[in-house]
């Protein structure tokens, strides 16, 4: 009897566990008009989402199979329309029967795209965009990230006026975070973790806070980059000493914690954007993302479209998967996609070999130089093939102790390599670049004397180690902080275009400082993020498109202060058409991701490097309505159901207004031709709005891409007043050659009038 009972219990447990395992979190998109009409006809007292969940529960429970009731995680009603829930396969089938159902997207985890820059960008205290009159305006920047360290000096509210009455946000209490943590600077803090915990399990509170408090540093860093207070005498152990400041340093900040140790759940990101728009943010900053997807299947694209409809400017990082082509994420045309580049500040080191050769490197190590020490590589192994990468447990202390170890990049993080060398008794580390990794130098907060080197120096060092007649030696010296390097230079890691889902729009849009950025950091989080690192800092130096994105978010807030009636598209246009393609020496911007650091192109930096002061007075703007964006989706041959996911309901693609994909009123031109196209042509129309001098005349200047003729009609446009809109057409003709598939050529189209030069890049690609 007991045996039968055990068998019964075991069978029940197995059946129940299978039912649980069958569950998955889905983001459900609904047609707002249809679903409300459908459920209200049944019970007008019940919320629409409750009616949907009840229908699924009742239908599934009436079947012969055991089903656990669906679990509702979020309801989305502002930036998109739908909900997130845990459903079984059967329940998903029942949901598909409901009139108004559009799509179900499985939830997934996305990743983070992991001072002096205001000066480098030309912002000056008391002048221009940083004038008292401009900074007096209230702008609220919402930051979706790993949370925030509210007590940091960068987020104190001294001198700020009371919180705007329009603000509807909240300060949610949680672990080590009370509602009193917010103030007139940090006006809101919310947590979104339901999707993450369904995917990765309950948050480990020994490693993270189950609240808006930041345990990783990333969110604190990005928030202060966008809008942190101006803090004098900030530095990283004396490096980069100066005033640390956000781009719009007296903006309010609202922190939305959506990212945890293992990533950021799409369902949580959607909920945060939905809530942020309802709360009343003016700008959204997202330094996170995944691979590019069709817009109807991209949660950030969908929610950002809804935010744009409400007048919210959305800035996103392009990603850190460069320099390979078509790696950029967050590429929807209504999103400002930001690449990363260097400023002219560096943290140089000097590596001297035993043969007298000297190489320049980079590091944030703040200690004494090493003496000339034995240099080892590969032969430091315990028999493990990964010893050249200095992975955990791969180094033999007997072979490493007291020596400098050369380590290849890859497999583990750069600071983890240094930690492994130190734990094995090594006295220093030289981080080697492969040929593919180029001349990119990383300044990292190493726990021992260490430096990174470019590929050419790395190649020489490998040869020296293998072929030196004497035992190889090296020393590392640390030279502090220097200024005046050629800049900007595109970072090799910055993700590139062309867009894999919308090649008719150039992506990324612009580049901004994203390498070696000094910004706020939680004092309980080590600068290297290593457990063995017991150092505490208030400011850390970090690199990534995660760092460039909040620069643009803060600059957009500055522009919004000057032009309160401008749409997100107009602000975006101003930032793009005034961006610079030249460095501080007057030469074209170079690219660390290309062979021999050749000149960067629009697939690396979009329209160029942001220029805040010029963007505040662009002369002309290319404006785009949400209807224009929807017609653009029509031109991509999206179905009505796919478009409805973004429009939140029925939208009919009218033939007469349907755009050619490249005909969106975008501030750049992406042109596609077949490889064997000869004399093939395409004509795009653009409309520009005068926001400069009331009475003004512009003449066009064209730099033609190789292999293409460009004709503009008319070649002169004349405005009578501010707000006037005039159109022009551009015809591109591919002539007389058979191109290689995937090859591109570049040019530009600029409208010139006095001090104004409204520039649009041209990218022609042969498919």
For each feature predicted by the language model, list its residue ranges.
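Loop-rich non-cytosolic ectodomains and luminal regions
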Residues: 2-767
